[in-house]
């Protein structure tokens, strides 16, 4: 049975423990209104990382499974490896780590695959330390790891994996955002690839002040709506006027998929992370499940197969596995 671990406090390592395994879920980042700031986990899909404490003072990756695409085994070029290198350096550890990564998240899907490997590795490694470090410290090392994948430090895929639920992620702190338990998320991943770096390149160029004002207004409406449990406020604000218009042309079928979600009573819908996955919020699980076939049909209409997940927005964080 999986063992849930409270990520808010350091848990002393079992004496003599040499191996630990952790699971970290996929995640939705940006959430339409919080570019590089907001994110939440997706229960039921994620990456598993096994970490062994070794005598050699190095970090090495022994295996990566679950993907047909070759991922770098060099620790410094892998998000999980780079995060553990950052941890080792900060603590001046006299020992090292060996990792095995089992991928459960499609690459370049907009579902936080690189972040999941990174956080799972840190959670497992933390259990092997004589004196485990705090979540805040782990988060800083995760930022170092995630920078390998995206080219910059941003925590919107990372923070939710440490705290669970909707999280506001600055570079200095993580702030949990209360969301009604009944609210659910639908995520649909079309079988297409959109590299994060390419998606970020689409954001280059000039922006108008009016766009920033509108986006700030939408962010405020969503946060206020979540805090108050007011679906109408969230519905008024859960739309992206800043990033989505620049990335949507890169995602075949996005406009049709978004419209299908909105036609089925979604509070809002937009791009998950860098895409091509699409997310939508609903007031109930039943509503989210009812919308899934329509959103998938929209992608099928442009020749794309897809997978769909319905999960609570308040999904759990990364956890150690027994």
From Swiss-Prot:
EC number(s) reported in the record: 2.7.1.39
Compartments (UniProt record): Cytoplasm
Protein's organism: Xanthomonas campestris pv. campestris (strain B100)
Enzyme class: transferase
Protein role: Catalyzes the ATP-dependent phosphorylation of L-homoserine to L-homoserine phosphate.
Reactions performed catalytically: L-homoserine + ATP = O-phospho-L-homoserine + ADP + H(+)
A single GO cellular-component term on record: cytoplasm
Example GO BP: threonine biosynthetic process
Chain coiled-coil ranges: none
Residues binding ATP: 106-116
Functional pathway: Amino-acid biosynthesis; L-threonine biosynthesis; L-threonine from L-aspartate: step 4/5
Underlying gene: thrB
Claim: Transmembrane helix is one of the keywords in the record: no
Assigned protein family: Belongs to the GHMP kinase family. Homoserine kinase subfamily.
Chief place of localization: cytoplasm
Entry keyword set: Amino-acid biosynthesis, ATP-binding, Cytoplasm, Kinase, Nucleotide-binding, Threonine biosynthesis, Transferase
A GO term for molecular function: ATP binding
Name of the protein: Homoserine kinase
Signal peptide (from-to): none
A Pfam entry, by short name: GHMP_kinases_N
UniProt-listed InterPro entries: GHMP_kinase_C_dom (IPR013750), GHMP_kinase_C_sf (IPR036554), GHMP_kinase_N_dom (IPR006204), Homoserine_kinase (IPR000870), Ribosomal_Su5_D2-typ_SF (IPR020568), Ribsml_uS5_D2-typ_fold_subgr (IPR014721)
